[in-house]
């Protein structure tokens, strides 16, 4: 089920027997959904087809929205929340450099800060919209398993950070440290 070229991450759906798959194809980052009922029926028959027999393209991430990283699927299977690295403005870059986490003097900088953010892809239409922008590197992202639109993610420094975990809502109206 997870074979094929350029496979990114795979997530099982919460509400149906499907699997969401990201693939980097040429210059595009694409999101697919795989019909696991059809796939496992063919496995049982001993006649498994090519991935295209089970996968449907949901959307292509626009390069203008940033460079996609990890993602998480909302508990209702309506949205994928995608971390991105982005260019940003000179003012944002200056603030990021000023506020970046610096390890103790005897520790190396493991991951340099970068301007990032979170975008969401509507898994019914493929539309991608901005959730938030951050002035630190966003790392691991998770969507609530119980409450639609709740997202938790980390400030990725390769180790410690002044504030490691963050919370936001899918509409961007809440963006705060998670204590």
Which ranges hold each PLM region?
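Beta-propeller domains
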Residues: 130, 134-179
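Asp-box/WD-like beta-propeller blade repeats and closely related beta-sheet repeat scaffolds
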Residues: 22-117, 126, 130-133
């Amino acid at each position: 089920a997870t074979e094929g070229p350029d496979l990114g991450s795979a997530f099982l759906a919460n509400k149906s027997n499907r699997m969401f798959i990201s693939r980097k194809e040429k210059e595009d980052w694409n999101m697919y959904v795989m019909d696991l009922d059809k796939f496992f029926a063919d496995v049982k028959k001993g006649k498994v087809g090519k991935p295209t027999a089970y996968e449907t393209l949901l959307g292509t991430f626009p390069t203008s929205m940033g460079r996609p990283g990890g993602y998480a699927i909302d508990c209702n299977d309506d949205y994928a929340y995608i971390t991105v690295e982005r260019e940003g403005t000179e003012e944002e870059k200056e603030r990021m450099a000023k506020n970046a986490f610096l390890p103790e003097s005897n520790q190396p900088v493991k991951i340099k800060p970068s301007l990032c953010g979170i975008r969401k892809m509507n898994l019914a239409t493929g539309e991608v919209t901005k959730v938030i922008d951050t002035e630190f590197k966003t790392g691991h992202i998770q969507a609530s398993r119980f409450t639609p639109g709740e997202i938790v993610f980390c400030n990725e420094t390769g180790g410690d950070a002044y504030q490691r975990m963050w919370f936001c809502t899918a509409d961007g109206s809440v963006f705060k440290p998670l204590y």
